[in-house]
Amino acid sequence: MKKSVCFTFGFLIFSASFSFAQLDKLKKTVGDKIKSVKTPSSGELSEEDVSAGLKEALTMGIEKGVNQLSKPNGYFGDLEIKIPLPKDAANVETKLRSLGQGQKVDEAIESLNRAAEDAANGAKDIFVDAIKNMTVVDAMSILRGEDNGATKYLEKSTRAALFEKFKPVVKSSLDKVGATKNWNTIFTAYNKIPMVEKVNPNLEEYATNKAIDGLFIQIAKEELSIRKNSAARVTDLLKKVFG
């Protein structure tokens, strides 16, 4: 009887030890699995895969964005990104139109947008280089986050550098299409009006910022399309990362 009890007790101890060992093994296996992200089509994704996929989506966005915005009416014909006069020049537009000089205002606004369309052609290499050189911190979080998360990350991390590189391109386009001349015409006309506060916004800075705004809007649209529309995932990497 004592032998039977001892045997039973020993067996229980062995079973418990075996079970704990199996449990530890199971926990390790599960832990290894949850360190990676899974998608229906790709299996496991590494941080490097996700980073490369986000960069590819952004590169595609700028390529399509440049193609769209550099067309005639790319800026001027799109109400979402059409460049108006600066907010601090609202009184200029209102006053000049009331004095019958609306055509000068219209010409200034149109030439401002034509300059942005012309400058867009020179944006591609500048933006693509910024994307390639971008270090994506916490790529997994960006992937799982907002539909424009990669675009917002790009803007936050590269906008200042993009502005400095893109500004000379915009300046050249402003001069090329006559926007600088038209800008000076309306503000000179306004500043000659008696009793008005003189206004003279910085054309190059304003135009560069607004042109960049339009490009980021287009990049965000492409990112959204890639995330939501499987047909937009035209490469193996995009299919792997975005499912």
Regions found by a protein language model. Give the residues of each.
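Bacterial N-terminal signal peptides that target proteins for export
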Residues: 1-7
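Bacterial N-terminal signal peptides
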Residues: 8-16
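N-terminal Sec/ER secretory leader and immediately downstream segment
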Residues: 24-109
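A cross-kingdom marker for long, charged
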Residues: 29-33, 204, 211-243
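Second-shell loop/turn segments in exported
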Residues: 43-54, 97-99, 108-117, 127-128, ...
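Mid-length scaffold segments of soluble, non-membrane domains
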Residues: 101-173
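An amphipathic alpha-helical core segment
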Residues: 165, 169-210
